[in-house]
Amino acid sequence: MENLETPVRILVVDDEPDIRNILHILLSSRGYEVDEAENGLRAVECVRAQPDYDLIILDIMMPGMDGVAACTEIRQHSVAPILFLTAKAQPADMSDAYG
């Protein structure tokens, strides 16, 4: 019998290629369909083109458009859950992420 379920689609956004690669390997090995973006602007472009992601993993600290600005733009096109990935750990950083 053919599996009619569509795979879960995840967008991984990070300016560090090694981080994107690790997440891609881990997630795709578990059956997730993974797209990658190297910065916030590219993430927004991906979501505009395909707003039906099931999850977006978004780095906060990126050159150009950071993760917080990208999140604001993404929210205009998608209701996908966004998981922030960051090395920042201060309470003010969490406040910034939640807007």
Language model features with spans:
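Non-catalytic signal-transmission and effector/linker regions of two-component phosphorelay proteins
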Residues: 1-11
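Two-component/phosphorelay signaling modules centered on CheY-like receiver
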Residues: 17-35
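Acidic, metal-coordinating helix/loop segments flanking the phosphotransfer/catalytic sites
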Residues: 11, 36-55
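Receiver (REC) domain active-site loop signature in two-component systems and cognate sites
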Residues: 62
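Residue preferences within the helical output face of two-component receiver
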Residues: 43, 74, 96-98
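Active-site residues of response regulator receiver
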Residues: 14, 59, 86
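Conserved phosphotransfer cores of two-component systems
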Residues: 48-51, 73-80, 89
